[in-house]
């Protein structure tokens, strides 16, 4: 009976495979929005104000960072929790595939969230005159919470790796 439960639990990891595939569909949706934004701004490029162009560019950078985060979570999560990716040697392979454990993934996700939050905060500050002060304060507090959380997670990971716990 114990063996049956252990085998069933181990096999249940495959339930995550469609979830990771769903993230690839989310990446497709993000790519569509990315190019929609580009095609929206290009016809007006000569008449758009510099500050508006910068806001669009920051939005594109933000979407790119989110896309990178999706790819990292998809591949690393699949490899860590479902199965190794069998990619032929002659094909282009990402250098970090197979080398990122759950702890490294967590730290990279935290760093990506801080970067995404930074871009968002910069976009907010570019339009600060139209945003109430208390809302600006909350944006900064939330961003600092992300930064502090990423720092603490990295520090705890360093302590765990050094064996001083």
Swiss-Prot record:
The lineage of its organism: Bacteria, Pseudomonadati, Pseudomonadota, Gammaproteobacteria, Enterobacterales. HAMAP family: UPF0114. This is UPF0114 protein Ent638_3411. One of its GO terms (cellular component) is plasma membrane. It comes from Enterobacter sp. (strain 638). Its main location: membrane. It is found in: Cell membrane. InterPro entries: UPF0114, UPF0114_bac. Belongs to the UPF0114 family. It is a multi-pass membrane protein.
């Amino acid at each position: 009976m114990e063996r049956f439960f252990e085998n069933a639990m181990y096999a249940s990891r495959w339930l995550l495979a469609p979830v990771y595939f769903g993230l690839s569909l989310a990446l497709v949706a993000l790519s569509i929005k990315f190019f929609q934004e580009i095609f929206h701004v290009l016809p007006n490029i000569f008449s758009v104000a510099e500050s508006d162009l910068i806001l669009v560019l920051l939005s594109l950078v933000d979407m790119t960072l989110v896309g990178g985060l999706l790819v990292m979570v998809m591949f690393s999560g699949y490899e860590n929790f479902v199965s190794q990716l069998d990619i032929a040697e002659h094909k282009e392979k990402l250098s970090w595939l197979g080398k990122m454990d759950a702890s490294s993934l967590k730290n990279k996700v935290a760093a990506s969230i801080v970067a995404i939050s930074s871009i968002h905060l910069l976009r907010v500050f570019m339009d600060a005159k139209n945003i109430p002060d208390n809302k600006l304060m909350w944006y900064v507090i939330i961003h600092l919470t992300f930064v502090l959380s990423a720092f603490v997670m990295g520090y705890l990971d360093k302590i765990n790796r050094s064996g001083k716990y």
